[in-house]
């Protein structure tokens, strides 16, 4: 398997777009999205044809600009139907891609690159990504890409992944949020503390709308981000409350709990795949952040981490 930045991560979608809140998000039905839709005068959305429990309606790929030459953000998962859809969409509108901007390395965003290069060899030197792989060009924070009708500014926004980029289209004061902020539910993250700091950075751009990598358009991006931050802070409090109760009630005031136990107590009986691929990694990340804040710690018991509250509240 190719490492970070590679294109053979196609089947690694299980922990890259998962809902954090299973009960509040996963059980809701998702609104249908059109395969191809002009969502603004400057932005055309093309679905990646990879719908699923974790990818929602599929990966959103975006054709940006109003002239013959345009930009493309993300390439989907490598589904042949997406390549056909992109090809017909570009041909029908006499569009020529001048550059491809990848939001991050995950396979449901980079998987379509080989198809693009097969269809459009002129793009071989025009695939851009932060921390680029061989043959790719770098994207730096603040870098600007321009085509007719679109001035797109890159924003380094780690959290969901180390190399994650968002993009601001200045003509609309809108932001392509990648997987940091989704149209429905909440994305999984690599490092919670970094992601939360990044959300505040994203808010500082004061963009109106958000164009996420999964889900429908976000009409009020800053309000959505505020909700995300509040949700994570609430989860931190809940985890700490559970650990405080366990410490008080068990083992003579020295009680502790594994991640698996905390997930069961907080979320109840959930789907095993969702539990193992989304909820347990998320709670583990919450615990790591609480440890950074010196509110919890862990000990090893039979080779397994058990977490406890440092100071009872």
From Swiss-Prot:
Name recorded for this polypeptide: Lactamase-like protein ptaB
Record carries keyword Metal-binding: yes
Residue numbers binding Zn(2+) 1: 104, 106
Enzyme nomenclature, EC number: 3.1.2.-
Catalysed reactions listed for this entry: atrochrysone carboxyl-[ACP] + H2O = atrochrysone carboxylate + holo-[ACP] + H(+)
Any one GO biological process: secondary metabolite biosynthetic process
Induction field: The cluster is expressed in rice fermentation medium. Three regulators are located in the cluster (ptaR1, ptaR2 and ptaR3), suggesting that the production of pestheic acid is controlled by a complex regulatory mechanism.
Binding of Zn(2+) 2, residues: 108-109
């Amino acid at each position: 398997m190719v490492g970070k930045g590679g294109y053979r991560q196609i089947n690694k979608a299980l922990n890259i777009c998962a809902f954090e809140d299973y009960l509040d998000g996963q059980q809701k039905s998702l609104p249908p999205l059109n395969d191809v839709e002009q969502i603004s005068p400057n932005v055309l959305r093309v679905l990646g044809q990879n719908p699923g429990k974790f990818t929602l309606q599929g990966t959103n790929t975006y054709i940006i600009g109003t002239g013959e030459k345009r930009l493309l953000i993300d390439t989907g998962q490598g589904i042949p139907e997406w390549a056909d859809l992109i090809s017909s969409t570009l041909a029908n509108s006499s569009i020529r891609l001048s550059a491809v901007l990848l939001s991050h390395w995950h396979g449901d965003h980079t998987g379509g690159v080989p198809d693009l290069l097969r269809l459009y060899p002129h793009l071989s030197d025009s695939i851009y990504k932060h921390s680029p792989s061989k043959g790719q060009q770098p994207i730096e924070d603040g870098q600007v890409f321009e085509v007719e009708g679109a001035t797109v500014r890159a924003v380094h926004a780690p959290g969901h992944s180390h190399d994650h980029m968002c993009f601001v289209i200045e003509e609309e004061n809108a932001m392509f949020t990648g997987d940091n902020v989704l149209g429905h539910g909440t994305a999984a993250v690599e490092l919670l503390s970094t992601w939360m700091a990044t959300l505040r950075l994203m808010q500082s751009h004061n963009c109106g709308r958000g164009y996420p990598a999964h889900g429908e358009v976000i009409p009020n991006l800053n309000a959505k981000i505020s909700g995300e931050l509040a949700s994570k802070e609430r989860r931190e409090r809940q985890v700490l409350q559970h650990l405080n109760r366990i410490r008080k009630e068990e083992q003579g005031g020295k009680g502790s709990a594994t991640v698996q136990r905390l997930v069961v107590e907080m979320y109840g009986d959930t789907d095993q795949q969702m539990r193992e691929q989304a909820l347990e990694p998320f709670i583990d990340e919450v615990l790591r952040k609480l440890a950074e804040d010196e509110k919890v710690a862990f000990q090893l018991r039979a080779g397994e981490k058990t977490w406890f509250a440092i100071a009872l509240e």
